[in-house]
Every structure is written in structure tokens, then in C-alpha cells.
Amino acid sequence: MNSDGVSHNTHTYPKRNNGDNFAVSPNNSTGVAVSFVVAENRPFRIGCDIHGWLQAWQLALDHPHGRRNTDGGKFTIESIPAGQHRVVIWHELAEILETVDVTIEVDGTTSLNKAFDASKFKLP
């Protein structure tokens, strides 16, 4: 979709899937379907070749448990099966990529608290 009054060129840069590169016309409310064959192991950049300052990040998963945190840094993931799981924490600006192993008990709730140096999140 493109709610802007100008065209954009969407260019994806996945590592494991084929990238896409297509134009999206102004005020396009339909959008363009993009699919991925395999899951990616980390987010990949999406850019606009017309407007080089525009970018976004996407993560193609093979499960429904991906989440973005709130402005306060919190998130909830529901319906995770019991067992050992790996949580991946990623942030493009602070260049954070960490993994944390967690155990989910049957019908249980697990909390994960991580703190990061706030100075890493300042705009360049």
C-alpha cells in the first residue's frame, strides 16, 4: 500500500529468500503481495530506491510468535507451547542482536527482563 501522493520503489533485501524490487503507484490502497519461501533468521531491510532515506525492516517467520515491543519496551507472546524456546532480541539502531533461552512450563507464564544501555539508542 502507498498512501503518499508520489510513487515509491519497494526493494527488499532478504538473506535466504529472493528479493523483490517493484514500483508502487501513488495512493495505492491495494498493495502488492510479497511471499517468502523460507523463514529468515534475522530482520532484513526494505528500502525505497526513489527515496533513499526511507527504510523499514521485516522478519519472515515460519511461526506466529514474533512480536514488536511497546514504547515502554514490553511485549507479550501468548499460546507458546511448553518447552525450551529461544527469544531473539534485535534492534537496528542500537545494533543489538541477542538470544535468551527460556523454559515455558505447561500452562505457565514466564517473565523475561533485559536491560540495555540507553545511550545506544540515541539517533546518529
Predicted regions and their residues:
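Extracytoplasmic copper-binding redox domains, predominantly the cupredoxin/blue-copper superfamily
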Residues: 1-124
